[in-house]
């Protein structure tokens, strides 16, 4: 055989050998491999009594014991007041949501937007509007639903949450963020924490307040009981929501009581407003909800003058009259005759509880006596002194005394915290990178009902074997190409 033929034959032999080795390497030690789970997204609108916010959540498409490991990736506060304030302009409620939806669409990948479950949950503000005028409430919901459907999302509906749902979803949020429901272990797995007590949740909104906790006794009133199954574990909770006891509605009820106690005179002396503070309001600004019905003899346009007297001794007495503290025999109560077992364990107080106490620098686990003294000291300051000290807070400055004393009355006389259990209350707005509220708990509970996606299953190799197989394939290709080139272009002598 001439020399050219020998070289070409050798190269072809090498090509065959390299190919066989590559084939063997690609066939041995093949393992089943699961690709990392994809990511799902969800949107929840929190349509509160004072404002609306949109939260964007994500979680792995596979789940841990049936519940998603959810994280907050974006939030957006809608401009303007809550959707209940659009009772006379329903279209405005829908239009107000669009800028936040645009922001959410920039976060969620385009290919996943159409399968993103989207919800709007309304709380006490819409509960009150529904009581006041159900037709207007339906019109507002129709317009916000229409606006959301203009976006490429899987809109699942707008609804009014019950008070118990609002409270219990807030409880889920608190305990999820503080890792009492599930925790990532050193072994690299999500596990249910052992010997960890769950936390209670205290929520104060504009129109309602909620208390939720796991009591140490059997819950006697099933109307205040809720059961959740999360991450494979059952939780039996006490929860109750008090409508009209949110900070805004309670303040209106207090103003109405002072007006009525003064025989409906045009000048109202307010012991909870700073001395020297003066404000002109109308009857309609006080008596504008089912919490504060308008007496028939009053004209909504009538002008009233409110003058602060700065009396922190008289203020709690006036606030306490808003609560009915009587209770039936042989049972424990919160207030208004509602059954409540004794408070137990640690509590997180958020929303209105946090905002007011944060302004007063009372979120640092101070004693009840210290909190009382601080609030009283603030209430004793006159209006000019407060404006000089806090010029940037002038719009809401007159409310901090009344809300501070209201919170104290609610927690101590209403929910029955005392000097010993007060230290168990933690005032907070966030935990980790997420806001504390009902929306995250709502989404966590919702993922129980969203089907799990099976992990994609493929065949895989050890990286070293895969690299070896690729190397021999490359060598086989090179040897084959050289053989072809020699055969075509090497001229025999």
UniProtKB/Swiss-Prot annotation:
Keyword Kinase part of the UniProt annotation: no
GO molecular function (one): metal ion binding
Membrane topology reported for the UniProt record: Multi-pass membrane protein
Active site positions, chain numbering: 166
Membrane side Extracellular: residue ranges: 29-463
Places the protein is found: Cell membrane
Organism domain of life: Eukaryota
Top EC class of this enzyme: hydrolase
Disulphide linkage map: 76-100, 244-291, 327-333, 379-401
Cofactor note: Ca(2+) or Mg(2+). Has lower efficiency with Mg(2+).
Residue spans crossing the bilayer: 8-28, 464-486
Annotated keywords: ATP-binding, Calcium, Cell membrane, Disulfide bond, Glycoprotein, Hydrolase, Magnesium, Membrane, Metal-binding, Nucleotide-binding, Transmembrane, Transmembrane helix
InterPro entries: GDA1_CD39_NTPase (IPR000407)
EC number: 3.6.1.5
Parts forming coiled coils: none
Catalytic activity field: a ribonucleoside 5'-triphosphate + 2 H2O = a ribonucleoside 5'-phosphate + 2 phosphate + 2 H(+)
Cofactor(s) it depends on: Ca(2+); Mg(2+)
Cytoplasmic side: 1-7, 487-493
Role of this protein: Canalicular ectonucleoside NTPDase responsible for the main hepatic NTPDase activity. Ectonucleoside ATPases catalyze the hydrolysis of gamma- and beta-phosphate residues of nucleotides, playing a central role in concentration of extracellular nucleotides.
Family: Belongs to the GDA1/CD39 NTPase family.
Listed name of the protein: Ectonucleoside triphosphate diphosphohydrolase 8
Record gene name: ENTPD8
């Amino acid at each position: 055989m001439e020399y050219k033929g020998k070289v070409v034959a050798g190269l072809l032999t090498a090509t065959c050998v390299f190919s066989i080795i590559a084939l063997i390497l690609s066939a041995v030690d093949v393992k089943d491999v699961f690709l990392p789970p994809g990511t799902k997204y969800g949107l929840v609108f929190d349509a509160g009594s004072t404002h609306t916010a949109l939260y964007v959540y994500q979680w792995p498409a596979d789940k841990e014991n049936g519940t998603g490991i959810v994280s907050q990736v974006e939030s957006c506060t809608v401009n303007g007041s809550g959707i209940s304030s659009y009772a006379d302009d329903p279209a405005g409620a829908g239009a107000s949501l669009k800028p936040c939806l645009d922001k959410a669409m920039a976060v969620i990948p385009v290919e996943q937007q159409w399968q993103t479950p989207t919800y709007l949950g309304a709380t006490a503000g819409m509960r009150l509007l529904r009581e006041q005028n159900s037709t207007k409430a339906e019109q507002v919901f129709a317009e916000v639903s229409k606006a959301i459907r203009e976006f490429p999302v899987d809109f699942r509906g707008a609804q009014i949450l019950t008070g118990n749902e609002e409270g219990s979803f807030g409880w889920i949020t608190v305990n999820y963020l503080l890792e009492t429901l599930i925790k990532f272990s050193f072994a690299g797995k999500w596990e249910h924490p052992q010997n960890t007590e769950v936390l209670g949740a205290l929520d104060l909104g504009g129109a309602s307040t909620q208390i939720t906790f796991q009591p140490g006794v059997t819950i006697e009133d099933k109307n205040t009981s809720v059961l959740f199954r999360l991450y494979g574990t059952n939780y039996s909770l006490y929860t109750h929501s008090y409508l009209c006891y949110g900070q805004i509605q309670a303040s209106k009820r207090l103003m109405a009581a002072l007006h009525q106690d003064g025989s409906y005179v045009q000048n109202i002396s307010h012991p909870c407003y700073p001395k020297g503070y003066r404000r002109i309001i109308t009857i309609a600004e006080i008596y504008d909800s089912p919490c504060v019905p308008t007496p028939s003899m009053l004209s909504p346009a009538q002008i009233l003058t409110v003058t602060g007297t700065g009396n922190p001794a008289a203020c709690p007495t006036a606030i306490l009259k808003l609560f009915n503290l009587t209770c039936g025999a042989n049972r424990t109560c919160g207030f208004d005759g509602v059954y409540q077992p004794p408070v137990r364990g640690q509590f997180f107080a958020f929303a209105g509880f946090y905002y007011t106490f944060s302004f007063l620098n009372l979120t640092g686990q101070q004693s009840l006596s210290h909190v009382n003294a601080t609030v009283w000291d603030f209430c004793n300051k006159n209006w000019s002194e407060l404006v000089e000290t806090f010029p940037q807070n002038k719009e809401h400055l007159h409310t901090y005394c009344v809300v501070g004393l209201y919170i104290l009355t609610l927690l101590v006389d209403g929910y029955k915290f005392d000097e010993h259990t007060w230290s168990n209350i933690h005032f907070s707005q966030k935990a980790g990178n997420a806001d504390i509220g009902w929306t995250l708990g709502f989404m966590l509970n919702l993922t129980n009902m969203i089907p799990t996606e099976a992990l994609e299953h493929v065949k895989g190799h050890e990286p070293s074997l895969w690299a070896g197989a690729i190397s021999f394939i490359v060598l086989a290709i090179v040897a084959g190409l050289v053989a072809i080139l020699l055969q075509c272009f090497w001229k025999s002598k």
